[in-house]
Curated annotation (Swiss-Prot):
Function: Probable component of a branched-chain amino-acid transport system.
UniProt xrefs under InterPro entries: AAA+_ATPase (IPR003593), ABC_AA/LPS_Transport (IPR051120), ABC_transporter-like_ATP-bd (IPR003439), ABC_transporter-like_CS (IPR017871), BCA_ABC_TP_C (IPR032823), P-loop_NTPase (IPR027417)
Primary gene name: livG
Protein name: Probable branched-chain amino acid transport ATP-binding protein LivG
Family: Belongs to the ABC transporter superfamily.
Domain ABC transporter: 4-248
GO BP annotation list: amino acid transport
GO cellular component term, pick one: plasma membrane
Residue positions binding ATP: 36-43
Source domain of life: Archaea
Keywords: Amino-acid transport, ATP-binding, Nucleotide-binding, Transport
GO molecular function, one term: ATP binding
Length: 257
């Protein structure tokens, strides 16, 4: 069952077609990867799906419902959480505080409760936050200010905030960009555990040498269109994909193949 499906999704900028009838689907409880060279339309695609850009043609369906051109805050309430290449935490707040203000509808009340005045329902949220931090191996940093975290830890904090919102689908723009290989693998292993719990992922990523083995399905984009899709072995053995990545270069593909 597909939790997300686009149908002939197109987007224009100044008369130029940035997305050309794109059909991409994400199975529930899967990790779907979108790859392609710079300028292929990957980021435009996820921005259009998550409501930051308006689609000019086509449809976006989430859990079978048409969500085309809904604003980002409405899409977020449905269980779709978009994370960005550069994390956007509240830097002066601690890791725990960043999680406590994440759930929709609590906001300021939770923030003031950090000083120690907990209501029963707030205690449950704090317990949930600590469970998530432990799962992501961030629990030892709970009282650290976000501005003191490493790049990889900030990426995990974004995931933790999404989990606080009970995300059904995480749309992630280069989640392991700038993250060392050890932490990258650890992060992706956490994603695999989350997908076993029913969470779905739509990921745009360039570091294919690390991410490919964790994915269930891959779409390759070029010039705003999907040119190939399939499993890892299908993509790596597809001459069209090799041609797109190599271009005029007689060197290895970015993924090391």
């Amino acid at each position: 069952m597909k939790i997300l499906q686009t149908q002939n999704l197109s987007k224009f900028f100044d008369g130029l077609k940035a997305l050309n009838r794109v059909n991409i689907g994400v199975e529930k409880g899967s990790i779907t990867l979108v790859i392609g060279p710079n300028g292929s339309g990957k980021t435009t695609f996820i921005n259009t799906v998550s409501g930051f850009y308006r689609a000019d043609e086509g449809k976006v369906f989430f859990e079978g419902k048409d969500i085309t051109n809904k604003p980002p805050h409405e899409i977020s309430r449905l269980g779709i959480v978009r994370t960005f290449q550069i994390p956007q935490p509240l830097k002066k707040m601690t890791v725990l505080e960043n999680l406590l203000i994440a759930p929709e509808g609590y906001g300021e009340r939770i923030f003031h409760s950090v000083s120690g005045r907990w209501l029963k329902e707030e205690e449950e949220i704090v317990e949930k936050a600590f469970r998530i931090l432990e799962f992501l191996k961030l629990d030892h940093l709970w009282d650290s200010e976000a501005q003191n975290l490493s790049g990889g830890q900030l990426k995990l904090l974004e995931v933790a905030r999404a989990m606080m919102k009970d995300a059904k689908l995480l749309i992630m723009d280069e989640p392991i960009a700038g993250v060392n290989p050890v932490l990258s693998h650890s992060m992706l292993e956490r994603f695999v555990e989350l997908k076993k719990m029913g969470v779905s992922f739509l990921i745009v990523e360039h570091r294919l040498d690390i991410v490919l083995k964790y994915t269930d399905h891959i779409y390759v984009m070029a010039n705003g269109s999907v040119i190939a899709e399939g499993k890892e072995e299908d993509i790596l053995n597809n001459p069209k994909v090799v041609e797109v990545y190599l271009g005029a270069q007689d060197s290895e593909i970015e993924c090391g193949v």
